[in-house]
C-alpha cells in the first residue's frame, strides 16, 4: 500500500531502490533479456557448454570489493550493465564473428538472469544495496531506551 507516493510502514525500501510496478517491469525486462539472449546465442552455432561455462563469468568482477566498496561497486556495475556486452554483440554481428557475438549474448544473458532474480546494480555503501534489492518487507529497527 502506498501513501502519498511513499511506501507504507510495512514496506521499508532502501534509498534508490525501485519498488512497486516499476520494479516488476524491471524483473520482466530481465527475463526478456535472458530469453532473447538464449535465442540469439542459438543462432551463433557455438557449443552450449560455452554458454554454461561462461554464464557466471561476469561475477568475477565482484572481486573488486576487495579493494573497497566504492571501487567494487563501480567495477561490478561496469560488468553488469548492458553497454559493453551490447557492443560485443554489435561488433560480432557487424564483423560476422560468431564467437564474439556468442560472448556478448552470454554476457547479456547473465545480466538478464541477474535482473530477473533481483540482483541489481550496486550502490557503493553496501554490496547488498542494489537498485532492485531492499524493497522486500522488512521489520522496522528496534530502538531500545
Q: Which functions belong to the PLM regions below?
A:
Residues 1-145:
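N-terminal membrane-targeting hydrophobic helices
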Amino acid at each position: 500500500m502506498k501513501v502519498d507516493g511513499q511506501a507504507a510502514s510495512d514496506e521499508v525500501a532502501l534509498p534508490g531502490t525501485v519498488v512497486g510496478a516499476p520494479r516488476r517491469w524491471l524483473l520482466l525486462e530481465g527475463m526478456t533479456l535472458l530469453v532473447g539472449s538464449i535465442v540469439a546465442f542459438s543462432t551463433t552455432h557455438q557449443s552450449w557448454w560455452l554458454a554454461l561455462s561462461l554464464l557466471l563469468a561476469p561475477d568475477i568482477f565482484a572481486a573488486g570489493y576487495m579493494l573497497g566498496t566504492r571501487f567494487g561497486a563501480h567495477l561490478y556495475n561496469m560488468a553488469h550493465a548492458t553497454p559493453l556486452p551490447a557492443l560485443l554483440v554489435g561488433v560480432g554481428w557487424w564483423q560476422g564473428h560468431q564467437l564474439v557475438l556468442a560472448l556478448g549474448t552470454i554476457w547479456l544473458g547473465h545480466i538478464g538472469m541477474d535482473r530477473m532474480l533481483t540482483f541489481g546494480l550496486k550502490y557503493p555503501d553496501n554490496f547488498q544495496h542494489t537498485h532492485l534489492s531492499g524493497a522486500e518487507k522488512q521489520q522496522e529497527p528496534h530502538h531500545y531506551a
